[in-house]
Amino acid sequence: MKKKQLYIGVLSVACCALVAIGITLHLLYPKKQIKNLVKTPPVLRLKPLTADTLKKKPVKKMDFNISGTLRDKEGKGVAGVIVSDGFNCVKTDAQGRYKMKRDSLAKFIYYSVPADCEVPTHSKTDRTAFFYQKVSKGKKTYNFTLTRLPGGKEIHYKMIVIGDPQVTNAYSPYYTSPDDNPIKKSDVERFTTQTMADIRQTIQNLPPGTPVYGLSMGDDVQYYGGYNAKLERQIRQALGSSEMRLFSVIGNHDQDGKALYRRKWEENFGPTDFSFNRGDVHYVCINNCFFHRGMAYYSPGELRERQVKWLKQDLALTPKDMKVVLCYHIPFTFGNAPFSKAKPLSNANEQGHYSSSRLSLLLSLLKPFKGGYELFCGHTHFACNHEINYQGEDVMEHCHAAACGNIWQSNINICGTPNGYYVYSFVGTSISNCYYKGTFWDKSKQMTLFRAQTDFNGEKYAKDWQLANNRNILVANVFNATSHWRVVAVEDGKEYLMRRISSKGQDAFAAGYHHKYSESVSYRFVSKGNGYLIMNHLYYYTPRNPNARIIIKASDPYGNTYTASSDEVTTEPFANFAHYYEKEHKK
C-alpha cells in the first residue's frame, strides 16, 4: 500500500512539473520555436502522404513543334512541296516555309522531291536518294536545299524497276560453265557484276540525255547465313553505282520482324513511307510488311492505321491531274497467309488466295486521280501481272520478278523468267513502253520455248497442265505478258492464237532445274507444293503438223512484237541459261 502511494505521489509531481514547463515555454517562445526545441526523434516521426507534404518534380514538357524552309540553290523558296515526319504531312507556302508538330515517334523529317528538282543522292558515286534528315532531340529547324532541273519538269523519262536484289551472307550455287563445278562468289558481287553491270549497259544504250531513275521493290538483303552489319550499306552502294538515281521500298527480309534489321535499313535508305514526283507521276512508297508473330507476316500485305492516316494526307496534298504509282513489297491482290479481314479471291484457279483488307480503301484513294494509277510490288520471285475483278472494277497489279531469281540459286525465277529487271518509259501520265530485261539477255528476247512432253528432271508441262504427251505441243513462257498481249503461233504461214494458262501451279523447267541445284531454298518453294505461285504467262499451241517449224509472235499493248522459233526450244534440263551465262563462260 505504501509503495502504491509513493508511485502516485511521484507521478503527480512529474505531471505538475511538465505543466509548469509547458506554461513557461508558451509565455517565453513563439510556436515555431517551440517545435524546434521539442523535436520528435526521426524514427518516431511519420509524415502523412498529403498533397501539401509531397514535393512534385517539375515535368519538362517536350515541344515537338518544328519548322523549316525549302530553298533552291539561288536561295529562292520552293513552294507547294510536301514535308512529312512519317505521321503527318504539310505543304510549303509561297516562300518555301513549313511548320508542323512532329510525332514523338518520328525518326526522320523529309520532303517529297518535286518534279522540277533533282533527286538528291548520298554522293556522286552512291546515287541512292537522300531526301531526309534524321530527327535530333531538341532540334527545331529542318531546312533543305533543292537543285532545280535545268530544263524544268521532265516530259519523258525511264524508270528501271528491280525486284528483290536479296543479297545474303551465304555463298549460293554459282556456275560459269556447263558443269557441276561451282565458283565461289558472294551475292553482292553477283548483283554488282551481273545485274548492275547489265543496267549500266542498258542506260548507256539509251539516247544521250535520257533521264533515268530506279526503284528497288524491297528485300534488298536477307540475313541468311548470319547477321552482317555492313550488308545494307553494301547493297545500297551497289544499287547507287549507276547513272540512275534510285529509291527503295523496304521488304519483309529487310526487317524479318527484328528492330535491329529495320534500323539498319533505315540507317541506309531513310524513311519507309515516303513519296516523290517525276514528270506527271506521283510515286508513293510504303511499308506493307505487317509482322504479327516474330518473322511471320500477313500475305497479302497490310497497313497499320497510322500508315493509312499518313497516306490519306499525302494523297490529299497531291494534284488530282497526276498519275499515282503505289509502290510496296508484298502484293495486295493475292496471298495465302491472310489477315482475318482479308477477302478470298473469286477466281476458282486461284483458290486459297486472298486480297488485302486494305485494297478497297486503297483503290478509293487512288481513283480520284485523273492520270490513273499503277500498283507496283515484288516479293514473290515470280513474274506476274496479276489481274482481278474487284468489286466490279478490273485491277492489275504489277508483281515484278526478282533480280536474284530464286535467291541466287540459279539464273532464273521460280516461274522460269530469267533474273533481271524492268524498263518503263513514262510520257506525261502514261506508260508508253515497258519491257523485261533479262540479265545478259538481249532486250528483244522476251520468251523461252519448250515442248510439253520434255522431261525436266521428272517435271513436265504436259503433266502439270493436262496437255497431250505425244503431240509436240509448243509451250511459250512470255515473261511480261498480260491479258492484253496477243500471242500467236505461225504454222505454214497461218496465225493461230495460243491458249493462255492462268492458274496456281509451277513451271516445269524451273522446278526440275532447282530440284537438282538449289541448295538453300527448298523444292517446295519452287514447285506446285508452294501453293502461292501463280503462273499466268505460259501459252501453248498444238501443231497441225508435229514436225513443222513454228514461229511464235508475242505482241504487247505498246506496239512491240517479239518473235521466237521452235528451233530454239530448250530440251536440256541442266546445262542451259538457268545454270550459267554464255557471256561469263566465254571469259
Positions of PLM-derived features:
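Extended active-site neighborhood of metal-dependent phosphoesterases/phosphodiesterases
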Residues: 115-123, 129-138, 145, 225-319, ...
